[in-house]
């Protein structure tokens, strides 16, 4: 079996390549193409067609996205291209080469006012990122009607710079010791990128066997936490001072972040069978520990969505 993972240089894509490691897997990057990654501009239909024509995959996974708030605000054309145009072109390419497609989307398509959200709940994105993710879903469905759209909540996992995820950025703030206010209203469901990748792998298997699930699937960890609660968990686990941490409501007050966009996963669980949930309390220490030193690099090329 052959798989192509678009966006394999990113947080999720890197774990996806591992999860599909028993297949012949080709990963693409754009600005980061170290190792075996192939450089592909996903806003170029020709570049996508060339790659898919060469690799002839059974399954395509699209992890391309532009989730940096600085780009939504400052370079909307680029953010739209990375989120919407790339999604449409990859979906067209997958259909043309006869591969099944899993397209990664986000819980930010919901407004967070009435959780839990089912795959057929009415989306109502609050910010540009959520609107782009929703527009991308529509484009994918039109271009490749049998694609599976997998919506995920905020992810954590091994990172290359602290700001690559909310969790590692918060860990850095806890360790830095400077006064910091963290939102204590919006509830997130941090999900390990390896768990998301494993679910995607299982979903891909089901699709390749020719099964047709609903076009949208949800996956999420079960434990809900605010950023402030995550900070306290980190401080407690590593015996760090917590007096500089203040509970705030910045994300909620801004009005463009869902307060609670919990995704209901029962449909996908029924289709896949038992899936091992990775428990946040058990997983987070290994992920944050390397970032608890003030010397660790905070910013890399990419900045996490808020
Ligand atoms: N991270 C989260 O918390 C989260 C939560 C829910 C859903 N998602 C969704 O999951 C997907 C993956 O997210 P992520 O966190 O892994 O993102 P990420 O770390 O920012 O990685 C994004 C990937 O997209 C690639 N890319 C961006 N523009 C491209 C272009 N024009 N052509 C080709 N590749 C391009 C990047 O390549 P280079 O870096 O090499 O340029 C990178 O491989 C996205 O759809 C995102 O919206 C993420």
Regions found by a protein language model. Give the residues of each.
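Amphipathic terminal alpha-helices
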Residues: 278-306
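NAD(P)H-binding glycine-rich loop region in Rossmannoid oxidoreductase-like domains
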Residues: 42-82
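Active-site Tyr-X1-5-Lys
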Residues: 124-148
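NAD(P)-cofactor binding segment of oxidoreductase domains
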Residues: 74-102
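Mid/C-terminal beta-alpha module of Rossmann-like enzyme folds, strongest
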Residues: 197-253, 295-302
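NAD(P)-dependent short-chain dehydrogenase/reductase
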Residues: 141-188, 195, 201-202
């Amino acid at each position: 079996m052959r798989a192509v993972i678009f966006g394999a240089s990113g947080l999720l894509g890197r774990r996806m390549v591992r999860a599909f490691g028993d297949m012949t897997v080709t990963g693409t990057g754009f600005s980061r193409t170290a190792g075996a990654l192939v450089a592909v501009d996903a806003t170029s239909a020709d570049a996508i067609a060339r790659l898919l024509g060469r690799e002839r995959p059974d399954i395509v996974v699209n992890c391309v996205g532009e989730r940096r708030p600085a780009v939504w605000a400052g370079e909307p054309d680029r953010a739209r291209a990375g989120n919407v145009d790339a999604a449409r072109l990859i979906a067209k390419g997958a259909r043309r080469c006869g591969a099944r497609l899993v397209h990664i989307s986000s819980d930010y398509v919901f407004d967070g006012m009435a959780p839990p959200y089912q795959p057929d709940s009415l989306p109502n994105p609050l910010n540009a990122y959520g609107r782009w993710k929703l527009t991308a879903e529509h484009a994918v469905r039109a271009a490749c009607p049998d694609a599976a759209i997998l919506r995920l909540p905020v992810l954590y996992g091994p990172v290359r710079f602290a700001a690559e995820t909310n969790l590692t950025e918060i860990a850095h703030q806890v360790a830095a010791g400077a006064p910091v206010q963290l939102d204590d209203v919006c509830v997130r469901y941090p999900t390990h990128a390896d768990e998301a990748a494993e679910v995607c792998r299982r979903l891909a298997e089901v699709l390749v066997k020719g099964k047709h699930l609903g076009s949208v699937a949800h996956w999420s960890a079960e434990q809900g936490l605010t950023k402030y609660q995550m900070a306290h968990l980190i401080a407690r686990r590593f015996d760090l001072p917590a007096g500089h941490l203040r509970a705030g409501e910045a994300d909620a007050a801004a009005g463009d972040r869902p307060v609670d966009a919990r995704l209901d996963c029962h449909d996908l669980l029924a289709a896949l069978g038992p899936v091992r949930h990775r428990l946040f309390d058990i997983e987070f220490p290994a992920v944050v520990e390397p970032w608890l030193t003030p010397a660790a690099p905070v910013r890399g090329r990419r900045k996490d969505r808020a």
